[in-house]
Amino acid sequence: MPEPGEIDRIPEKSVVLVEEDTGYMKDFYTHKVAALAAGEGKNVVYLTSHPAEDIRAGMRHYTRTLPGTLQVIDGARPGDNLLGSCTGDLCIIDSFSSLSIDRDSGELMHLLSGMREYARKGRSFLLVSDMGVLPAQHEQLVRAMADGVIRFVALVEGDRIKRYMRVLKMRGVLPVDKIIPLTITDEGLQIDTRERLG
């Protein structure tokens, strides 16, 4: 199982898809990745359709002061030039699914190819997606072209909801053979490190 610090970062020079059916675990995760990367001095661009203050508030779970290397660009809309806005070492596009809803498969392929080209030159992309928003063929295209795919899952177990992270694939990393249990606290998203018995 990955160590706690390993899932808080994505590999450099990569395009990584973070997806979830319904919920906010992916948001907690991307806020943590952005805050930690900016805290390490990386230039982070967070391109979003959500209010910038909501994004910054989410990141404050992980750092008291948001570094100057973090730029939140809100008001993004479908059809915007996503690649043109994505400068810096790490670009987070939230929500990639809603911002790409009007793209046909050729446009989507062109956009993802451009991201991969930029990634090979040193930039990383984190694409945040709500499953089921894009047509199934488009969702599968994004998964196929991404260097990594992380999926968040919530399951009902008895009278509780258990949250998990699945790393479906990640360039340069051996396949993970376990799902990673998570908890959400006042401090944000945390790996549940308690060993399960039985």
PLM regions and their residue ranges:
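Pre-Walker A adenine-sensing motif
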Residues: 1-9
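Phosphate-binding/switch region of NTP-binding enzymes
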Residues: 133-188
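Short, well-ordered beta-strand core segments
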Residues: 16, 44, 125, 149-151
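Short, charged, intrinsically disordered terminal tails
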Residues: 193-198
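Short gly/ser/thr-rich secondary-structure transition/capping motifs
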Residues: 1-2, 75, 129-133
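P-loop NTPase motor core
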Residues: 83-145, 149
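Conserved, well-folded catalytic cores of nucleic-acid-processing
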Residues: 36-40, 58-65, 99-102, 115-118, ...
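Conserved P-loop
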Residues: 12-79
